[in-house]
Design a protein with these regions (language model features):
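Gly/Pro-rich hinge or "lid" segments in bacterial periplasmic/extracellular proteins
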Residues: 78-83, 171-225, 229, 346, ...
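Ligand-site clamp/hinge motif
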Residues: 217-263, 390
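N-terminal lobe/hinge region of extracytoplasmic solute-binding protein
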Residues: 45-96, 126, 193-196
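Alpha-helical secondary-structure segments
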Residues: 117-124, 151-155, 198-199, 226-229, ...
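Structural transition elements
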Residues: 320-354, 372-375
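Surface-exposed binding/hinge segments that line
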Residues: 93, 138-182, 204
Length: 519
C-alpha cells in the first residue's frame, strides 16, 4: 500500500471527526478574511506555565502551545487530517522496510545562525533517543542509528518498519534545537533559553507571568510570520484570562472550559471556535505501587466513575465520555473495548473486597489548583465515595505536579490531568504504556503482549493491519486498567475579532501559522 493510499483510507475512516474540524462543528470563520498584513503583537492568555522550553526535556502536553512557535519540526501535520507533510524535511522515503531517508530543506538556519543541515538533524535525533535527560526516548524506539548520507540527507536504520515515524517527527521528536546552543549549555539543555528554527525567536520568560517572543526575520517560510511578536500572559485562572480578553488586554485565549462558552459568546467583540479533539481528561495511575499495583483496585477505580454524569457536570455536556484513549470517530477506535469499563459501583465494591482494600483508606492523587480542576476533583471524589473509595488531591501548578508524579519523587498514586493527543495513536500508547516510558508514572511492568501489539501497530503501512493491532492495544490497556480515561473535551478558543487566520486542529494544540492582526 502506498503512503498516499494509506492516508486516503484514513481520511475516509476519520470523516466524522475531520469533517467537523473542517468547519461544521466550529463556530466562527475558520479561514482568514481579507488580505493578511504584517505587524502588531499577538497577545495570548495562556493557562499554564511551561514545564520546559526544551522539547526533549519537557513533561507537559501544554508545553506545545509555546514550543510550536519557536521550533519547527522535520515533518508537519495537516490541521484537518493530521496527515504528515513536509516541514524541515522537504521529503522522506522508506528505501526498504528498515531504512528511512530524510532529505533536509536547504538554506534554513537556527535562530543563532547555526546551519540546520544533516549534521544538526543527526545530533538532535541521537540526543532525543539517547540523552538521559530526554523524555521522548520512546518516540524513537525503532531508530537503531542515524547517519549523515549527504550534506542535507540523514538516513535512519530501524530495528523494525515504523509506519508511524513520519507522524512522530511532527511532534517533539522532530523539533530541532541548535546544537551550538546545546553544547554551550552547562545543563545540557535549553529549558530556559530556547534556540530553534521556528517562526519566532525567544526574548524573555518571567516565570509564571509572561513569555515574550519576536518574529524570526530569517524564517524560511515566505512572508511568515505576520505578527511582529507574541506575548503569552500566564493566567492559570481561566475566568481571569477570559476577562483579560473581553477587556482587550489580551487578544486570544485557548483551552477554555465549556462553562466559559456562554460567557465568551455573549461578547460582541469576540469570535469563538469550538469542536472535537483528541484531548482527553484522564487519571494517570501508578500501577507500580499500592494500591494500584493490584489490578482489582484499578478496575474498581474505573468502574466507580460515571463518565456520562462527569461530562454533564464538569464539562457542560461539551465532551465525549472516554472509555479508552481514542474517541469514537477515530479510525483506530474499537467499540468493543468500551464495554470493559461500565459504571458499576456495586461491582467496584466487590472487587475492592476481594483485594482486601478497606473502606475509608485514602488514596492520594495529584491534581491542579485552578477552579475548573478543583470542580472536576469534587465530582470525582463524590463518585468514588459511593463505591467506598476515598481520595485526597495534592494540588500544585501543572509543571510542578507533572514533574512530581512522573519524575523521581513519584508523588501520589495517580494524577488527574489530560493527555493532549498525538498525530499518530501509536505515540499515545508507547509514551504511556511501555515499561520505560516517561508517562508510565511508576515505570511499572506491562504485559509483553501489549508491548508487542504497540510495535505491531507501527510495523505496517496498511491501515487495516494497523487497526487490528490497535484493537489489541486498546483491549490490553483497559483489561489491565492502566489508566482511567474520563472525557474527550472539545477545543474552545476565543479571540478578538481583529485576530484573523486562526485555524483549529484535531490535536487541540494551538498553532499560529496563518494568524495576522487587523489594524
Amino acid at each position: 500500500m502506498t503512503r498516499e493510499k494509506m492516508w486516503t483510507t484514513r481520511r475516509e475512516a476519520m470523516a466524522l471527526l475531520s469533517g467537523a474540524v473542517a468547519g461544521v462543528a466550529f463556530g466562527g470563520d475558520v479561514r482568514a478574511q481579507g488580505t493578511p498584513k504584517r505587524g502588531g503583537i499577538l497577545r495570548i492568555s495562556a493557562p499554564t506555565n511551561p514545564s520546559s522550553l526544551d522539547p526533549a526535556t519537557g513533561g507537559a502536553g501544554s508545553d506545545h502551545a509555546f514550543l510550536f512557535t519557536m521550533y519547527d519540526t522535520l515533518t508537519e501535520w495537516d490541521f484537518e487530517t493530521l496527515k504528515p507533510k513536509p516541514g524541515l524535511a522537504e521529503s522522506w522515503s522508506f528505501s526498504d522496510p528498515t531504512t528511512f531517508v530524510l532529505n533536509i530543506r536547504p538554506g534554513v538556519t537556527f535562530h543563532d545562525g547555526t546551519p540546520l543541515d544533516a549534521e544538526a538533524v543527526k545530533f538532535n535525533l541521537e540526543r532525543n533517543k539517547s540523552d538521559p535527560k530526554s523524555n521522548i526516548k520512546a518516540d524513537l524506539a525503532t531508530m537503531a542509528s542515524a547517519s549523515v548520507t549527504g550534506p542535507m540527507q540523514v538516513t535512519l536504520k530501524l530495528n523494525a518498519l515504523d509506519a508511524a515515524l513520519p507522524g512522530i517527527l511532527s511532534d517533539r521528536a522532530g523539533m530541532m534545537v541548535s546544537p551550538t546552543a546545546l553544547k554551550a549549555s552547562a545543563a545540557g539543555n535549553v529549558a530556559r533559553t530556547p534556540v530553534g528554527a521556528g517562526a519566532y525567536t525567544f526574548v524573555s520568560w518571567a516565570d509564571g507571568e509572561k513569555i515574550v517572543i519576536k518574529r524570526n526575520e530569517k524564517y524560511w517560510k515566505p512572508n511568515r510570520p505576520y505578527p511582529d511578536g507574541i506575548e503569552f500572559a500566564i493566567i492559570p485562572e481561566l475566568t481571569t484570562g477570559v476577562r483579560s480578553v473581553t477587556a482587550g488586554q489580551n487578544d486570544l485565549i485557548y483551552q477554555l472550559p465549556p462553562r466559559q462558552k456562554v460567557v465568551v459568546e455573549r461578547s460582541k467583540d469576540l469570535k469563538v471556535f469550538n469542536g472535537p479533539t483528541l484531548y482527553v481528561f484522564q487519571i494517570f495511575l501508578n500501577w507500580a505501587k499500592p494500591p494500584f499495583d493490584d489490578i482489582r483496585v484499578r478496575k474498581a477505580f474505573n468502574m466507580a466513575i460515571d463518565r456520562e454524569s462527569f461530562v454533564k457536570a464538569a464539562l457542560a455536556g461539551l465532551a465525549e465520555p472516554a472509555y479508552m484513549n481514542l474517541p469514537k470517530s477515530h479510525w483506530a477506535y474499537d467499540k468493543s473495548v468500551a464495554a470493559l469499563t461500565p459504571y458499576d459501583p456495586a461491582q467496584a465494591r466487590k472487587l475492592l473486597a476481594e483485594a482486601n482494600f478497606k473502606e475509608g483508606t485514602t488514596i492520594d492523587l495529584v491534581g491542579y489548583p485552578d477552579q475548573d480542576s478543583v470542580q472536576r476533583q469534587e465530582i470525582l471524589i463524590e463518585q468514588l465515595r459511593k463505591a467506598g473509595i476515598s481520595v485526597r488531591f495534592l494540588n500544585a501548578p501543572i509543571a510542578e505536579a507533572s514533574a512530581a508524579f512522573f519524575g523521581a519523587e513519584k508523588r501520589g498514586s495517580g494524577l488527574l490531568a489530560a493527555w493532549t493527543g498525538r498525530p499518530d495513536p501509536s505515540l499515545t500508547y508507547s509514551l504511556m504504556f511501555t515499561k520505560d516510558a516517561y508517562y508510565n508514572g511508576g515505570r511499572g511492568a506491562v504485559p509483553p503482549e501489549l508491548e508487542a501489539a504497540i510495535k505491531e501497530s507501527r510495523a505496517s503501512e496498511d491501515v487495516q493491519i494497523r487497526t487490528k493491532a490497535f484493537a489489541t492495544v486498546q483491549r490490553l490497556v483497559m483489561e489491565n486498567a492502566f489508566v482511567a480515561p474520563l472525557a474527550f473535551q472539545f477545543e474552545l478558543v476565543a479571540m478578538n475579532k481583529k485576530v484573523q487566520g486562526y485555524r483549529p486542529n484535531l490535536l487541540g494544540k494551538p498553532k499560529y501559522d496563518d494568524v495576522w492582526l487587523e489594524s
